[in-house]
Amino acid sequence: MVELGIKGYQEEIVTPELLACHIGSGTVRVFATPLMITLMERTCRLSVQPYLDEGFETVGTHVNVSHVSATPEGMKVWCDSELIGIDGRRLTFKVVAQDSHGIIGEGTHERFIVNVARFQAKTDTKLE
């Protein structure tokens, strides 16, 4: 059962594939904002997945974060998340990303609990 206060943690090393200049979000050799957001989403998703029934997953629906400090290639970055709101199937998380010099990004992220088979079937109707 999903409850308020569930915490998550994920970390990674900023490799060349995670740089803004590599993914096209900029020309500088720094941790790309879209991939910081990916780290935040993954941290939230993995934190609650063990509490969901089989066949259920969460999908990201809203991101409200600031990327406040650049991180160069080779540094470790990590994200902490905390589930701070539950409204039916909507989950709201506080997210904070850091490197060894401090906070690099923070904000909130919302996810919805979905039945995977039903969600995929509904989405696939767009192909018809």
Where are these regions (language model features)?
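Hydrophobic beta-strand-centered segment that forms part of the acyl-chain substrate-binding groove
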Residues: 46-78
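C-terminal output/interaction extensions
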Residues: 105, 112-128
